């Protein structure tokens, strides 16, 4: 990521995908610190560390990892989105946060997972000082 950002123009923004970066072995907080001025959009996708820990990268592909359930929504995985969102807030990020999860809907019902992700994102964004306007999704 650093090499790409250092060799691309300042006008090229970064879509920070926390789950993909963590899956690839990157440090999400370090990426925010190093490239905050160019972050234009954030995907808040979580990872399941136990899936990564047993993945044989010499034999299993990215798609295999997805099928095994490596990704999930915030609040259901291993990343600390409280720290991630706070770091973004500390650097003045004011763009979109989009919950994303690539997972099997038969194993993880989409509406329930959307509720889990929404609840966690609202919790960490409020704690980081963001004002969030909602249209009622996820209300109890």
Show the residue positions of the predicted features.
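Histidine-acidic metal/acid-base catalytic patches
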Residues: 1-16, 20-140
């Amino acid at each position: 990521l650093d090499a790409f950002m250092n060799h691309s123009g300042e006008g090229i923004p970064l879509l920070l995908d926390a789950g993909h970066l963590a899956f690839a072995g990157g440090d999400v907080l370090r990426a925010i610190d190093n490239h905050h001025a160019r972050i234009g959009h954030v995907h808040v996708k979580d990872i399941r560390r136990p899936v990564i820990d047993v993945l044989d990268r010499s034999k299993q592909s990215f798609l295999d990892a997805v099928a095994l359930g490596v990704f999930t929504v915030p609040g259901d995985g291993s990343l600390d989105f409280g720290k991630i969102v706070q770091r973004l807030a500390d650097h003045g990020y004011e763009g979109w946060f989009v919950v994303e999860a690539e997972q099997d809907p038969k194993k993880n019902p989409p509406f329930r997972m959307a509720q889990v992700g929404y609840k966690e994102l609202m919790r960490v964004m409020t704690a980081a000082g963001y004002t969030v306007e909602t249209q009622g999704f996820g209300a109890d």
